[in-house]
C-alpha cells in the first residue's frame, strides 16, 4: 500500500515538472511558405489563425530569414506575441527556386518534430511565399482553410493525384518510385492548381500541365470521382463530358531487370453527362464508338506521358517497385540503365453509360 502511495506522489511530482504549453500562450502555425533570398539565405513566411470575440477569425503573417528552418522559425517567433509552434500545420508551400537549395533539409527537420503530422499538404509555387499568403482570396475562409480545401477537394474529386507530407518523404527514402507535388499559381485574388511537378529524388525534373493530369492520375492513382472532357475527332466543337469516374490501371512486367517489358491496362467506368454533337445515345453501337474513341485517346496520351517519364529519368508510376515484386533475381543497377530504353504497351478499356445526357 505504501508503495502505491509513493508511486502516486512521484507521478504527480513528475507531471508537475513536465514542460507544458498552454494554447493561449503560443501561436499555432497553419501554413508555412519557404523561399530563397540573397546569399543563399532561407526565408520563411508563417500564417497563424487568431480568433477574436464571437468566433470571428483573422490571419496573422510573420516572416523571417536565416540559414536553417529552425533559425527562421525562431526569428519569426521574435515578432509574434507568443512562440510559433507547428502542431496545427496544414500546408507547406515551397517556391520553385528553393527546391535545389534545401527543400530536403527543411522536410527532414519538420519530420523530426513530433508535433508535425503526416497528413500535411505540400505544394510548389512560382510566387513569393509572403505575397501568396497575404492575398485576399476568400471572405468565408482564412488562407489555411482555403489552401487545404483547394488541395483536398481536387485530390478527392478532381484530376489531382493524391500526395502529402508522409507519402512524399516515404518516396524520398524508398527507391520504389519518384515523387510529385501539386503546383499552385496566383492570378489576381484567385489561387489555382496549375499542374504537378515531377521529381527525381529531391530535384524537380519536369512539369505536367493541367490538361494532362487526367491521364497522369490514371497512371499513378485510383480514380474514385471526377469529371473529364474529351475532344472527339471531326468538328472542332465536338466534345463529350464524363463524370462519376471509377478507374484503375493494372501493370504487368515481363522479362527481367535487364530486358523488362511493361503492360499497362487502364480500366475506366464513367457516365456521359454532356455531348455536343447530335447522336442517338440510346443506340449501343454509338456508345461503343464513343468508348473506342475515348480509349484510343487515353492510350495515346498515356504513351506520350510514359515516354516523357523515361526521357526525364523519373518514375512516378512506381515501376521499380513492380519489378522488385514480380521479377525474380531483380537487379536495381541493371534497372537504372534498362529504364532508359524501357519497352511498354498501353491499352485502355472504357465503359460508359448515358446518365442524364444533355446535348
From Swiss-Prot:
Membrane protein topology class: Lipid-anchor
UniProt entry tagged with the keyword Membrane: yes
Residues that span the membrane, as ranges: none
GO CC, one annotated term: membrane
Domain of life, source organism: Bacteria
Location in the cell: Membrane
Sites of N-palmitoyl cysteine lipidation: 17
Signal peptide positions on this chain: 1-16
GO BP terms: spore germination
InterPro entries: Spore_GerAC-like, Spore_GerAC-like_C, Spore_GerAC_C_sf
Keywords: Germination, Lipoprotein, Membrane, Palmitate, Signal
Lipidation (S-diacylglycerol cysteine): 17
Stated role: Required for the germination response to inosine. Has no role in L-alanine germination.
Family the entry assigns: Belongs to the GerABKC lipoprotein family.
Protein name: Spore germination protein GerQC
Provenance organism: Bacillus cereus
Gene this chain is encoded by: gerQC
Amino acid at each position: 500500500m505504501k508503495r502505491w502511495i509513493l508511486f502516486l506522489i512521484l507521478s504527480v511530482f513528475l507531471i508537475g515538472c513536465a514542460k507544458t504549453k498552454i494554447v493561449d500562450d503560443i501561436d499555432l502555425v497553419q501554413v508555412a511558405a519557404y523561399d530563397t533570398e540573397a546569399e543563399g539565405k532561407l526565408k520563411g513566411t508563417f500564417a497563424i489563425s487568431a480568433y477574436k470575440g464571437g468566433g470571428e477569425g483573422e490571419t496573422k503573417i510573420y516572416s523571417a530569414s536565416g540559414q536553417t528552418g529552425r533559425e527562421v522559425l525562431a526569428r519569426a517567433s521574435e515578432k509574434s506575441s507568443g512562440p510559433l509552434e507547428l502542431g496545427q500545420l496544414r500546408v507547406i508551400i515551397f517556391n520553385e527556386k528553393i527546391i535545389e537549395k534545401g527543400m530536403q533539409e527543411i522536410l527532414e527537420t519538420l519530420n523530426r518534430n513530433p508535433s508535425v503530422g503526416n497528413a500535411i499538404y505540400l505544394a510548389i509555387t512560382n510566387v513569393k511565399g509572403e505575397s501568396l499568403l497575404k492575398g485576399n482570396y476568400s471572405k468565408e475562409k482564412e488562407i489555411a482553410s482555403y489552401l487545404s480545401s483547394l488541395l483536398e477537394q481536387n485530390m478527392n474529386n478532381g484530376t489531382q493525384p493524391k500526395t502529402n507530407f508522409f507519402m512524399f518523404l516515404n518516396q524520398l527514402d524508398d527507391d520504389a518510385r519518384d515523387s510529385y507535388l501539386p503546383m499552385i499559381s496566383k492570378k489576381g485574388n484567385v489561387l489555382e492548381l496549375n499542374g504537378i511537378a515531377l521529381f527525381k529524388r529531391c530535384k524537380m525534373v519536369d512539369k505536367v500541365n493541367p490538361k494532362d493530369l487526367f491521364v497522369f492520375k490514371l497512371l499513378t492513382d485510383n480514380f474514385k470521382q471526377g469529371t473529364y472532357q474529351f475532344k472527339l475527332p471531326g468538328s472542332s466543337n465536338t466534345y463529350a463530358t464524363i463524370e462519376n469516374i471509377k478507374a484503375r490501371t493494372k501493370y504487368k512486367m515481363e522479362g527481367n531487370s535487364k530486358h523488362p517489358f511493361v503492360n499497362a491496362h487502364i480500366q475506366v467506368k464513367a457516365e456521359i453527362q454532356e455531348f455536343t454533337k447530335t447522336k442517338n445515345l440510346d443506340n449501343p453501337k454509338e456508345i461503343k464508338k464513343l468508348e473506342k474513341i475515348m480509349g484510343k485517346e487515353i492510350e495515346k496520351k498515356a504513351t506520350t506521358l510514359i515516354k516523357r517519364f523515361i526521357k526525364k529519368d523519373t518514375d512516378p508510376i512506381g515501376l521499380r517497385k513492380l519489378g522488385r515484386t514480380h521479377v525474380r533475381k531483380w537487379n536495381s543497377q541493371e534497372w537504372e540503365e534498362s529504364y532508359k530504353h524501357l519497352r511498354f504497351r498501353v491499352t485502355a478499356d472504357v465503359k460508359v453509360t448515358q446518365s442524364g445526357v444533355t446535348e
